[in-house]
Amino acid sequence: MAVLEIVKHPNEVLETPCERVINFDKKLVKLLKDMHETMLIADGVGLAAPQVGVSLQVAVVDIGDDTGKIELINPSILEKRGEQVGPEGCLSFPGLYGEVERADYIKVRAQNRRGKVFLLEAEGLLARAIQHEIDHLHGVLFTSKVTRYYEENELE
């Protein structure tokens, strides 16, 4: 496994919708492993492929609970319910945090590393992290959804 360089804003790859994954091969498995390692070393809870310069619909999420690592390939949100408002940051925007409204519950359809379709239900922080990463895959940045920015001392 390798730690990848995280793309910082501004960069065109962050604002470009990603291509769907067609080839479920060893290159994809390596990308997933490298992304997960990169996310953990950077102390993140999610990482999307465009954040490492790869314009594919691939994301990894791990919020540090017993859900563990979630790999999302070609994900789409089928259902959203409720709302939550809270702080978000992004590894591509170091030191920038803002308040963002997200659905509190989501149901997602995605594929695993072998191409098998699965459904996932999530709520709370996990739902927030997944929505943030899926936005990345469509070229949507969290800064476009911020209702107010936080000073660093507000987050302590």
Swiss-Prot record:
Gene: def1
MF terms (GO), sorted A to Z: metal ion binding; peptide deformylase activity
Essential cofactor(s): Fe(2+)
Keyword Hydrolase attached: yes
Class of this enzyme: hydrolase
PANTHER family in UniProt: PEPTIDE DEFORMYLASE
CDD domains membership: Pep_deformylase
Record-linked NCBIfam families: pept_deformyl, PRK00150.1-3
Signal peptide, first to last residue: none
Reactions performed catalytically: N-terminal N-formyl-L-methionyl-[peptide] + H2O = N-terminal L-methionyl-[peptide] + formate
Lineage start: Bacteria, Bacillati, Bacillota, Bacilli, Bacillales
Originating organism: Bacillus anthracis
UniProt: Fe cation binding residues: C90, H132, H136
HAMAP family documented for this protein: Pep_deformylase
A single GO BP: co-translational protein modification
Family: Belongs to the polypeptide deformylase family.
Active site: E133
Enzyme nomenclature, EC number: 3.5.1.88
UniProt-recorded name of the protein: Peptide deformylase 1
Pfam families: Pep_deformylase (PF01327)
Keywords in alphabetical order: Hydrolase, Iron, Metal-binding, Protein biosynthesis
Note describing how the cofactor binds: Binds 1 Fe(2+) ion.
Keyword Amino-acid biosynthesis: no
Function statement: Removes the formyl group from the N-terminal Met of newly synthesized proteins. Requires at least a dipeptide for an efficient rate of reaction. N-terminal L-methionine is a prerequisite for activity but the enzyme has broad specificity at other positions.
Superkingdom of origin organism: Bacteria
